[in-house]
A protein has these predicted regions:
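Catalytic glycan-binding domains that act on GlcNAc-containing polysaccharides
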Residues: 1-148
Length: 148
């Protein structure tokens, strides 16, 4: 597990490399709730891997692009937070492109290829984004957040 500072550097680097909003990646990270080494089974037989919960459907393309076996890609993505974030940023960039540059639709498609089914996920990411913004504003201005 990376330190917060190193995680932030990875996130910013991945954001810049893939030209996707860092705050969107951060909100997705919060919603996904993953961590290094985590592998979650899905009903359709795929698995979600690591910090950003990268779906194993991406493994064949990544294995081809990196010229290494899918099993090795799986371990790397599952266990390396920085690489996991970088792959997530690449996926988000791909999904935004598929949505003709619409960031919100790209975020919805990050979770589900069908935009309609991605809407609930998009709502979660937007809520996470605003929650993070409130926390940052509160810290910046020395305001205490109300506890619910």
């Amino acid at each position: 597990m990376l330190s917060c500072k190193l995680l932030a550097k990875c996130l910013l680097w991945a954001s810049l490399q893939n030209q996707v909003p860092a705050d969107a990646l951060l909100a997705i990270m919060e919603v996904e709730g993953g961590r290094a080494g985590l592998e979650v089974s899905n009903a359709n037989g795929t698995h979600d891997l690591g910090l950003m919960q990268i779906n194993t459907c991406w493994l064949p393309d990544l294995a081809r692009a990196w010229s290494i076996p899918s099993s090795q890609v799986r371990r790397l993505i599952r266990d390396n937070d920085c690489l996991n974030i970088t792959v997530a940023a690449h996926i988000l960039k791909t999904k935004i492109r598929e949505a003709q540059g619409d960031i919100l639709q790209g975020i919805a498609r990050y979770n589900n290829a069908h935009p309609h089914y991605g809407r609930p996920y998009l709502g979660k990411v937007i809520r996470a984004y605003f929650k993070q913004s409130r926390r940052a504003f509160s810290r910046l201005h020395g305001v205490r957040e109300k506890r619910k």
